[in-house]
């Protein structure tokens, strides 16, 4: 990866939010979003929620429909990297984006009618603790109060969504919930190759120059991407970078993706901890101690350090830890097998 031009790498792991048209690789979901946007503009009340697996492109999808289906100003309400369940941080997120002081209600009312509020990764505003639902409940109140005059588009990973809806009334706040489906082999091929072509580099696959690769060879290659990634486009994009063996004279030499041969996760404690990272996306050690209040801090720390050494978890910064994205499908499959996640 160090040999790759920065701009090429960013095409696959950076935030790709700029687009002059609706994306063309999620026709079913776009049709649902168009219908929902039409109803939202009729001021019937309610937000649009997009759910899916982590790395499945929820933020990209929401940014695309927010800019292409609505005419109002866009306000992106961003979470702290490791998340927060403190209402004061939620208020500050609105203040930073809108550039004013005041309560959330005052800030929303200061924006033009029909403004669009994008809230990515709602699971980062939530915690599986008794006090962890306060911001979720506040969001429900905000949507029910303001969605007649303003538009709200949210996204959340599907596993957190299933849990949160069991203990809150937040489903009542949504006009529609759109589930992002796994990508097909063809969708993965189109997405990866369109980004590759944008990067301006050529490639060699199995000693065959790019222009000489036939349809069957492309099909064989991307079937493997589909199988190993479980159709998760974010995982597939990272796999593409990982399978670049070398770069020479603006030419990429790529190999077939290979499924990582990982032993079964047999430690029950590891599985339980990993399930919390799937639900919350990323966590600090302090958050973990709140989620596991009956465990000694030293014991929780030992689990985390073991999972980092096993490369299942990675440090995102000094205090924030997350799942290794390359191993996400393997971890999801392991948790489903252990019945810690729904299939």
Feature locations, PLM:
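A short, basic N-terminal segment
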Residues: 1-40, 341-343
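Walker A/P-loop nucleotide-binding motif
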Residues: 42-64
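Winged-helix-like regulatory helical subdomains adjacent to P-loop NTPase cores
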Residues: 223, 237-299
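AAA+/P-loop NTPase substrate/partner-engagement loops
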Residues: 68-97
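Conserved small helical "lid"/interfacial subdomain of P-loop NTPases
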Residues: 178-218, 228
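Conserved Walker B catalytic segment
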Residues: 107-171
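Short amphipathic alpha-helical interaction segments
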Residues: 293-310, 315
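Short, amphipathic alpha-helical interaction segments positioned at domain boundaries
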Residues: 327-343
